[in-house]
Amino acid sequence: MTRMKYLVAAATLSLFLAGCSGSKEEVPDNPPNEIYATAQQKLQDGNWRQAITQLEALDNRYPFGPYSQQVQLDLIYAYYKNADLPLAQAAIDRFIRLNPTHPNIDYVMYMRGLTNMALDDSALQGFFGVDRSDRDPQHARAAFSDFSKLVRGYPNSQYTTDATKRLVFLKDRLAKYEYSVAEYYTERGAWVAVVNRVEGMLRDYPDTQATRDALPLMENAYRQMQMNAQAEKVAKIIAANSSNT
């Protein structure tokens, strides 16, 4: 019992010291151009935490200074790279609200998509190789919306090519989730729900493997409901897909 108390106390002390060591450093009251130069050097070095410290000091001390908009853009990037994703989201929303016509607004939209993708990801599950397709894709949907708006609104943006590639990945992610839901309804014999779910997949994600994989679930659901004519139509689609692969 004494040993357990010692271990708990030691763990608590370690957490306290870690919190102290991670506290923000004081930024000298230098001219804004010097603080900005220091922040840029920290960004180039990949020292995201110290870059954030410098940039936040600039943002707080000179909110309407000559570097204000660039500081906000740099903070978005630094927060994202440092995995401070809620802070990145807040900085993005703030920038769009205050600067809706900024020439780099396409970059901010791109960063919002990246941030939502990162929020959808799970480092722990990814490390252990856990399939994430059945998790709520709230942030994946948001990222899909972000990148779609970027591609439609700024087709000539330098970020559009990468955004388009990410849309393919996100479409597959969302379709896999819908497939997992259709499987869930199949296991419970909720045949109408299965049909409705797969119909949604055919409408929203027709060119994904998950949608093709869901067609047998739809066929089976129709047969369970004695709707054989509809089941035969789905069976023909399945056969046509098989002949084209």
UniProtKB/Swiss-Prot annotation:
Signal sequence segment: 1-19
Covalent lipid adducts (N-palmitoyl cysteine), residues: C20
Lipidation (S-diacylglycerol cysteine): C20
An individual GO BP term: protein insertion into membrane
Keyword Signal among record annotations: yes
Keyword Signal attributed: yes
Compartment(s) where it occurs, according to its Swiss-Prot or TrEMBL record: Cell outer membrane
Membrane topology: Lipid-anchor
Consequences of knocking out this gene: Depletion decreases the density of outer membrane proteins, but does not significantly affect transport of lipopolysaccharides to the outer membrane.
Superkingdom of this protein's organism: Bacteria
GO cellular component: Bam protein complex; cell outer membrane; membrane
Key words of the record: Cell outer membrane, Lipoprotein, Membrane, Palmitate, Signal
Domain notes from UniProt: The N-terminal may interact with various proteins as a chaperone to assist in the folding and insertion of proteins into the outer membrane. The C-terminal region may serve as the link between BamA, BamC and BamE.
NCBIfam families, sorted: OM_YfiO, PRK10866.1
Quaternary state and interactors: Part of the Bam complex, which is composed of the outer membrane protein BamA, and four lipoproteins BamB, BamC, BamD and BamE. Forms a subcomplex with BamC and BamE. Interacts directly with BamA. The Bam complex has the shape of a hat, with the BamA beta-barrel crown in the outer membrane and the periplasmic brim formed by the BamA POTRA domains and the 4 lipoproteins.
Family the UniProt entry places it in: Belongs to the BamD family.
Function comment: Part of the outer membrane protein assembly complex (Bam), which is involved in assembly and insertion of beta-barrel proteins into the outer membrane. Constitutes, with BamA, the core component of the assembly machinery. Probably involved in transient protein interactions. Efficient substrate folding and insertion into the outer membrane requires all 5 subunits.
Protein name (Swiss-Prot/TrEMBL): Outer membrane protein assembly factor BamD
Encoding gene, per UniProt annotation: bamD
